[in-house]
Amino acid sequence: MNSTEEIDLYNRWKALERQLEMLDLQEGFIKEDCKSLKRELIRAQEEVKRIQSVPLVIGQFLEAIDQNTAIVGSTTGSNYVVRILSTLDRELLKPSASVALQRHSNALVDILPPEADSSISMLRPDERPDVSYADVGGLDVQKQEVREAVELPLTQGDLYRQIGIDPPRGVLLYGPPGTGKTMLVKAVANSTAANFIRVVGSEFVQKYLGEGPRMVRDVFRMARENAPAIIFIDEIDAIATKRFDAQTGADREVQRILIELLTQMDGFDQGANVKVIMATNRADTLDPALLRPGRLDRKIEFPSYRDRRQRRLVFQTITAKMLLSPEVDLDTFIMRPDASSGAQIAAIMQDAGLLAVRKSRGVILQSDIEEAYARAVKPTDMEQFAFYK
């Protein structure tokens, strides 16, 4: 190797050495930058946690203005233009979504899951009523109609498609108090594998504007997400009376709830496996738009007056687990037309059992039932039932 080649190799070695020193220096700078960025990341995460720390204000996302600002509604009824936390996923910000607002600046700092502020819940399998169809005395026609309208479409929907007809979308149970409407629905909940959602009409009437319609949307959304499902709305007349020219804000809000209910019943398709059952004591006060075919296709009446056969079945069902004296003649009470409703007959036998307990007897005597009958059945009872006709 000549001297020229040695000089070239030496120069190349020196250049690589300088380059290595430069890389070592850059590595040190990068490590320092990484440490600084990690400290900034930790500070930013702590700041986000501080901003998202409870208590927060619950609001409703209304509309996005741009990527950084949006319009939200608060529980007080006011609307605000607020900033959106940069770490939030904009794809999850849908209209009517529940959001959390920072309590001082009202900045949108979190997106709540749909169920977070919903007061609607489904009955778990272990929470289902232990009432079966056998526990409902009489009402053979009503049982058959409910099964055809609710159970059969959920369990054997192919039969309806084979024939070429749509199954009933909703069912209305109407009749005086104590005639077995709610008890029959409990039997439906117990006998089907479908998810069961129960609400009372008055629960939709909330303090703040817009809360009632939002709850209606939550009920139907939950039912669609957990299909097959049954929605039972008891005392539907609380929100579905005939519309009129409302003069107060409360009346207008109730009418908005009804409109949302009508919209939701029109909105879900027949294949969603969602059935709606409504119950009321005053079917004559309901809005005609709710009663039209396509919403409540089946209307099942629960009569206040029961014939002897129906009363016999009710007495037999109620007394099946009771210890009656051999002298008890139930036909004596079955022949009397006064005790008409199942709840009234159940109250008579319950009171008779309490009389036997009071006298420290292990069996119920005829005299106990007679005394309980005299207490429970008043001459004005039949006149009270006339109010619901």
From Swiss-Prot:
Its main location: cytoplasm. It is found in: Cytoplasm; Nucleus. Keywords: ATP-binding, Cytoplasm, Nucleotide-binding, Nucleus, Proteasome. ATP binds at residues 175-182. GO terms for molecular function: ATP binding; ATP hydrolysis activity; proteasome-activating activity. GO terms for cellular component: chromatin; cytoplasm; cytosol; nuclear periphery; proteasome regulatory particle, base subcomplex. It comes from the Eukaryota. InterPro entries: 26S_Proteasome_ATPase, AAA+_ATPase, ATPase_AAA_core, ATPase_AAA_CS, NA-bd_OB-fold, P-loop_NTPase, Prot_ATP_ID_OB_2nd. PROSITE patterns: AAA (PS00674). SMART domains: AAA. One of its GO terms (biological process) is proteasome-mediated ubiquitin-dependent protein catabolic process. Belongs to the AAA ATPase family. The 26S proteasome is involved in the ATP-dependent degradation of ubiquitinated proteins. The regulatory (or ATPase) complex confers ATP dependency and substrate specificity to the 26S complex. This is 26S proteasome regulatory subunit 6B homolog.
